[in-house]
C-alpha cells in the first residue's frame, strides 16, 4: 500500500472541525502507567498506556475510558495491513460534547509500530479529539506527520486483527452521519461492524 495514501487516509477520514483546545472539556490526569481492557464482539484485548509517551493523549484516553465513552462504539474503519480505527460515540449528544474539544499536538516519542495506539488527527494543527487507531504493521512513516503513540496493545492483538474489515477502503461509513445519527446509522447500513462492549481501566502502576 502506498505510504502517502495511508497517511492521507487517516487525515481524510476525519470530518473538518475547527481546532479549539480550550473547549470546556476537562480531562483527568492519568497515572504514569495504566491498562485499559476492551471487551469486544470478537473478544478482549488490553492496551497499556505510558503517560510519558504523550501526556495529553494519555489523559484524554484515560478520561474517555473512565467515563464509558467507548462502550458500544464501532470499529468503523478497519483496513487489513494498515490499521483499525474507532472512537466515535454511538450517542450523538455525547459525541457532540467533544465536537470542539481538540487536543494540542505532541511530538512523537514512540513509533507507529504494530500494536501501537495513536489518536487520529487532521493535517491542520491540534485536531486530535476522540478517534483512535491501532497499527496493524510498522507504519513508522506516520511519525513524521505527528501521529504520536500513547500506548500499545499488550494482550489480544490477534483479536484486533480479527475485527471485521469487509467494507474495505471504498465503502467507509460517513463520519458526519455517525456524529449526527450515531449507532442507528451504523446498525442499519453497516451491520457487520465489530464493536466495543465495554472498556474499563484494568489496573494502575
What kind of feature is each model-predicted range?
Residues 4-7, 13-205:
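Cyclophilin-like peptidyl-prolyl cis-trans isomerases
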Amino acid at each position: 500500500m502506498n505510504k502517502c495514501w495511508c497517511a492521507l487516509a487517516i487525515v481524510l477520514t476525519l470530518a473538518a472541525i475547527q481546532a479549539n483546545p480550550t473547549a470546556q472539556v476537562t480531562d483527568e490526569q492519568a497515572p504514569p502507567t495504566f491498562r485499559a481492557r476492551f471487551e469486544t464482539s470478537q473478544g478482549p484485548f488490553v492496551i497499556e498506556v505510558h503517560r510519558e509517551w504523550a501526556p495529553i493523549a494519555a489523559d484524554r484516553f484515560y478520561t474517555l475510558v473512565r467515563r464509558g465513552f467507548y462502550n458500544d462504539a464501532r470499529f468503523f474503519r478497519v483496513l487489513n495491513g494498515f490499521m483499525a480505527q474507532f472512537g466515535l460515540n454511538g450517542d450523538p449528544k455525547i459525541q457532540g460534547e467533544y465536537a470542539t474539544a481538540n487536543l494540542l499536538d505532541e511530538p512523537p516519542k514512540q513509533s507507529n509500530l504494530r500494536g501501537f495506539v495513536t489518536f487520529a488527527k487532521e493535517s491542520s494543527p491540534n485536531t486530535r479529539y476522540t478517534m483512535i487507531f491501532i497499527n496493524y504493521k510498522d507504519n513508522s512513516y506516520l511519525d513524521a506527520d505527528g501521529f504520536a503513540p500513547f500506548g500499545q496493545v499488550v494482550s489480544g492483538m490477534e483479536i484486533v486483527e480479527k475485527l471485521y474489515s469487509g467494507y474495505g477502503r471504498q465503502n467507509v461509513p460517513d463520519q458526519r452521519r455517525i456524529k449526527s445519527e450515531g449507532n442507528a446509522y451504523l446498525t442499519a447500513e453497516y451491520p457487520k461492524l465489530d464493536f466495543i462492549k465495554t472498556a474499563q481501566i484494568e489496573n494502575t502502576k
